[in-house]
């Protein structure tokens, strides 16, 4: 059985209504994407730590509806526009989707990934290429972080090169938990992961258990205001700038901060946001993304 995808670009405030209308009119699935994804205009959706996102769609949103081959998408789009009192009917594009063994296709897109010198991220349906390496068994799922994105790889490379045995670690915006898990496998001590998304917290706990790693994962409001030897945050530049004071305060004096999710052109402004507390510099770049690192100045010696 073949399928059809109908793609409509709409304004932010219409995204949820169009999604509901298309689904009610027979779409098999509906997703909303950033129409500016992978461009300089790409927008993150985020809220302050512990709060819900303030926006549910992007300024330019793309609604993608899937239909079976017997449905006429033109009639559905027209009916949805009428139901929403939208005139004229917005332009849309159609593209065919051939039926396939979707499980096998998905699995074929995720091969083991080597990161740094000795780290391998291995999906559960593959054997580890090097059993003596640092192996992370991780499948694509609900939360960001499988090692395929340059920002994740950069953070993992930094950890491999710099983590010290027994250091305490905070992974802020932990996603899948991959950075917390690799830190533990590289010898870190007590490790905590924080995310504002409950699904990410659940995914991190599951992945830690699968990898036989002891680490704690929780929502921000459930974690004490402790300081750590290492704080790593792989998010995006705007939330990193907003959280500069908070993240800097979670680094103990003499501890280190690692930031990624930052484009090369954004590195200077992110570093400037942290300058009052921690001097940050670019450690390494990859495919236009950077990893920044810095050390919090040690507390002045007591001269009394």
Curated annotation (Swiss-Prot):
InterPro entries given in the database record: Ribosomal_L11_MeTrfase_PrmA, Ribosomal_PrmA_MeTrfase, SAM-dependent_MTases_sf
Keyword Endoplasmic reticulum: no
Gene Ontology molecular functions: protein-lysine N-methyltransferase activity
EC class (word): transferase
Alphabetically ordered keywords of this record: Cytoplasm, Methyltransferase, S-adenosyl-L-methionine, Transferase
Summary of the function given for this chain in its UniProt record: Methylates ribosomal protein L11.
Subcellular compartments: Cytoplasm
Binding site for S-adenosyl-L-methionine: 152, 173, 195, 234
Xref: Pfam families: PrmA
Keyword Nuclease: no
Family: Belongs to the methyltransferase superfamily. PrmA family.
S-S bridge residues: none
Lineage of origin: Bacteria, Pseudomonadati, Pseudomonadota, Betaproteobacteria, Burkholderiales
Protein name: Ribosomal protein L11 methyltransferase
Organism of derivation: Cupriavidus metallidurans (strain ATCC 43123 / DSM 2839 / NBRC 102507 / CH34)
UniProt-listed Enzyme Commission number(s): 2.1.1.-
GO process terms (BP): methylation
Catalytic reactions of this protein: L-lysyl-[protein] + 3 S-adenosyl-L-methionine = N(6),N(6),N(6)-trimethyl-L-lysyl-[protein] + 3 S-adenosyl-L-homocysteine + 3 H(+)
GO cellular component, one term: cytosol
Main location: cytoplasm
Gene behind this protein: prmA
